[in-house]
């Protein structure tokens, strides 16, 4: 295959990043699945592909593939990696970039400390925009599970779909079992990422996330944004929230519901390599 890649991570949410500007890259679903295997491949949560854009005002196309090969529209941790990747490898000299994903535009700012701030846009709550099959918009929805039990959750889109559940203790939350049931629930026709949120105080939440196509990851940028938005809208938290994930902390700023929500956090390089087959 002979494709150069870079392994990166954002708080342990790990990626391979591919330069589609200087290389011709066409990966199949099966190839991505094989590369994502942590025993026989490289191992990663997502595969990120940066490509040239022909659209004025957009610096790059930013494509995101989950470990199951599915292309998705949002990844906040990956966006921070893409920004540092583009500058490090000389694809741009700019510290402020605009990238286009499958579903949205994102503004990325590389800060002086090499953290990256990501404009994640304005969160959307309308069921049709999430998407969620529901008769009307509601602060909370009830889903009936296969075992007959009912679970209450919030639903929101931040460029990709998220369900958020309030729990007393994330350490004992059934993230994998319940997360999987909700992620594949037929009321979410494009599947859904599932966040389990514990409110610590007015300015901090703890969070674990089951990501569609991946399972639980130790950090999820868009999940942090979704949970912080729900916390601010329905639980009266501050306009600046620290989200503590198993992999570390992210800062979310959201001055008001009509403004874009901003995610700030680190990104790190791990190693370079070449895909041989």
Swiss-Prot record:
GO molecular function annotation: diaminopimelate epimerase activity
Pathway(s) where this gene product acts: Amino-acid biosynthesis; L-lysine biosynthesis via DAP pathway; DL-2,6-diaminopimelate from LL-2,6-diaminopimelate: step 1/1
Xref: PANTHER family: DIAMINOPIMELATE EPIMERASE, DIAMINOPIMELATE EPIMERASE, CHLOROPLASTIC
Compartments, record wording: Cytoplasm
Active site (record annotation): 75, 220
Function, in words: Catalyzes the stereoinversion of LL-2,6-diaminopimelate (L,L-DAP) to meso-diaminopimelate (meso-DAP), a precursor of L-lysine and an essential component of the bacterial peptidoglycan.
Organism: Legionella pneumophila (strain Lens)
Family membership: Belongs to the diaminopimelate epimerase family.
InterPro entries registered for this protein in UniProt: DAP_epimerase_DapF
Binding site for substrate: 13, 46, 66, 76-77, 160, 193, 211-212, 221-222
Domain of life: Bacteria
Main location as per UniProt: cytoplasm
Catalytic activity: (2S,6S)-2,6-diaminopimelate = meso-2,6-diaminopimelate
Database matches in Pfam families: DAP_epimerase
Oligomer and partners: Homodimer.
Gene, per the UniProt record: dapF
UniProt name for this protein: Diaminopimelate epimerase
């Amino acid at each position: 295959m002979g494709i150069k890649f870079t392994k990166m991570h954002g708080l342990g949410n790990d990626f391979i990043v591919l330069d589609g500007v200087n290389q011709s890259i066409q990966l199949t679903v099966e190839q991505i699945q094989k590369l994502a295997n942590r025993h026989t491949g490289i191992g990663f949560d997502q595969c990120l592909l940066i490509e040239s854009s022909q659209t004025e005002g957009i610096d790059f196309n930013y494509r995101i593939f989950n470990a199951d090969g599915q292309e998705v529209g949002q990844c906040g941790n990956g966006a921070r990696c893409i920004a540092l990747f583009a500058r490090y490898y000389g694809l741009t000299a700019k510290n402020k970039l605009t990238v286009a994903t499958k579903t949205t535009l994102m503004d990325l700012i590389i800060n002086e400390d090499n953290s990256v701030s990501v404009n994640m846009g304005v969160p959307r709550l309308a069921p049709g925009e999430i998407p969620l099959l529901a008769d009307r918009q509601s602060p909370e929805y009830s889903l009936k599970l296969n075992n007959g039990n009912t679970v209450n959750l919030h639903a929101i889109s931040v460029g990709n779909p998220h369900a958020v559940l309030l729990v007393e203790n994330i350490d004992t939350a059934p993230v994998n079992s319940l997360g999987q049931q909700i992620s594949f629930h037929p009321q979410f026709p494009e599947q859904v990422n599932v966040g389990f949120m514990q409110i610590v105080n007015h300015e901090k939440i703890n969070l674990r996330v089951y990501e569609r196509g991946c399972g639980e990851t130790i950090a999820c940028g868009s999940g942090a944004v979704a949970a912080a938005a729900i916390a601010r809208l329905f639980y009266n938290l501050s306009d600046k929230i620290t989200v503590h994930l198993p992999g570390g902390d992210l800062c979310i700023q959201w001055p008001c519901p009509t403004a874009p929500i901003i995610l700030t956090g680190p990104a790190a390089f791990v190693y370079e390599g070449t895909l041989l087959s």
